[in-house]
């Protein structure tokens, strides 16, 4: 609890908390193709406790902030989105309504989140300066090193994106994307 209080009071995390180790997890296909790996960031345990508190806060309010058609929110199921599309197709066929279905996939979407935009979105949705400052501290000076075959890369400064494997990352992404969808 002292660490959390210190981070909130100081508005910053320690250097060891902001440093991540990226492991590449093989998905499928050709092991020589880097696209067949998913990066996951391993993060300091103290940091994960603090970011877990942020994730819990976000999880509690996201269902009220995110449109009901968005299924990337705790308590909602992907199958709900599938049923909605199926019902829409059925309605259009039954009523003779012309339509089109567009499926968009944002490649490397977690890597493309602009931090300043994300902080503004948090403010737009009513998160206070202490909460936004805490999230901001997660990204100020954040670095990662990639671990491959037992060897570390040089340190990489994280100028944008949310970290794979960080508890609030998917929630911050969904909240940021909601502004673009509405």
Segments predicted by a language model, with ranges:
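Conserved pre-catalytic core of RNA-dependent polymerases
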Residues: 1-182
């Amino acid at each position: 609890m002292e660490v959390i209080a210190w981070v909130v009071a100081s508005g910053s995390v320690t250097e060891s908390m902001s440093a991540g180790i990226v492991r590449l997890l093989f998905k499928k296909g050709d092991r020589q193709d880097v696209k067949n790996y998913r990066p996951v960031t391993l993060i300091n345990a103290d940091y994960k406790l603090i970011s877990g508190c942020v994730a819990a806060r976000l999880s509690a309010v996201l269902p009220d902030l995110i449109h009901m058609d968005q299924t990337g929110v705790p308590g909602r199921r992907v199958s709900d989105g599938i049923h909605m599309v199926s019902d829409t197709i059925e309605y259009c066929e039954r009523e003779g309504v012309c339509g089109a279905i567009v499926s968009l996939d944002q490649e490397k979407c977690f890597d493309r989140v602009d931090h300043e935009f994300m902080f503004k979105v948090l403010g737009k949705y009513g998160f206070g300066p202490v909460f936004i400052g805490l999230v901001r501290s997660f990204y100020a000076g954040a670095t990662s090193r990639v671990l491959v075959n037992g060897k570390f890369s040089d340190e990489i400064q994280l100028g944008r994106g949310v970290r794979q494997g960080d508890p609030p990352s998917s929630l911050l992404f969904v909240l940021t994307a909601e502004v673009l969808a509405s």
